[in-house]
Amino acid sequence: MELPLSQATLRHTLLLLPALLSSGQGELAPQIDGQTWAERALRENEHHAFTCRVAGGSATPRLAWYLDGQLQEATTSRLLSVGGDAFSGGTSTFTVTAQRSQHELNCSLQDPGSGRPANASVILNVQFKPEIAQVGAKYQEAQGPGLLVVLFALVRANPPANVTWIDQDGPVTVNASDFLVLDAQNYPWLTNHTVQLQLRSLAHNLSVVATNDVGVTSASLPAPGLLATRIEVPLLGIVVAGGLALGTLVGFSTLVACLVCRKEKKTKGPSRRPSLISSDSNNLKLNNVRLPRENMSLPSNLQLNDLTPDLRGKATERPMAQHSSRPELLEAEPGGLLTSRGFIRLPMLGYIYRVSSVSSDEIWL
């Protein structure tokens, strides 16, 4: 007498029955949530548990999970058997935390009897709110009043976002824009939204709003200035030009300073102050320097009376003593201190000339 099946065993048997009927006699076919191939939309960071079931065969099946080709550890796994070895099956559960980098989940089965593999796949469609990667504007002078503005925004979103351009006063300027899907392999979910419009005022602050089923994101553009529309000078060019101007100014200032210093040196000239070397307390000797007339002078202890010609013999009446404070004169030619040429000799000083003058009796040179 056979024992009645329990309710739990009956329920699992009914779940495995569609897989057993679809797989055919002697073939094992895993299914994920009742389907061999499916696509599942998940929001980013959402947790979802997938269940892989297999039915049929005479041996115990082996199930394994692969996420983007990487082997994963199952959350739970359970084997079923009904009526001994005549009917067997199993289930395995794996929980996924959705990330935008995830693409495909596979449940792989290795049939112990035939050795042939079988797979069930789920394509993961991870959705997230829009992200504005870059926003900008290009301004051009329009034929009419105002500015011709080309607005562009790089938006990354899944599903694709609807982009709206709004001005500072609130009303919608443009509610639709042309968009271009970029390289989907290198830049997934990235689109370029571009719109062209004409502004009548320069004081506009524009903003872009991107929306999809997951969320809303906005970004603002600076007000287009008049200088930005007419002058576009790279920052590097400004820095280089400033450096060149500063270097030129410093070089010119240095050149002017050098010229001024040279001119002052030429104006002053070399020092002409003579250096006197005292060889004796009564005798003075000039260095080999030619003195200008205004700097030449007689010895400090020389008096003009000593050089006055006295043909009547006054010079002989005033003998010169060795202890006198005045310097001794060289012996004059016969006839007095003056020579026949009109000058006298002083020790080691050369000649002193006497010439006639209009303003005075005589001038000593």
Curated annotation (Swiss-Prot):
Record PROSITE patterns: IG_LIKE
Cysteines paired by S-S bonds: 52-107
Transmembrane domains' residue ranges: 233-253
Glycosylation sites: 106, 162, 192, 205
Subcellular location: Late endosome; Lysosome
InterPro entries: CD80_C2-set, Ig-like_dom, Ig-like_dom_sf, Ig-like_fold, TMEM25
Extracellular side: 27-232
N-terminal signal peptide: 1-26
Domain Ig-like span(s) in chain numbering: 30-123
SUPFAM superfamilies: Immunoglobulin
Keyword Signal annotated: yes
Alphabetic keyword roster: Cell membrane, Disulfide bond, Endosome, Glycoprotein, Immunoglobulin domain, Lysosome, Membrane, Secreted, Signal, Transmembrane, Transmembrane helix
Tissues expressed in: Expressed throughout the brain with higher levels within the hippocampus.
Segments on the Cytoplasmic side according to the record's topology features: 254-365
Keyword Signal included in the entry's annotation: yes
Quaternary structure and partners: Interacts with GRIN2B.
Name of this protein: Transmembrane protein 25
Natural source organism: Mus musculus (Mouse)
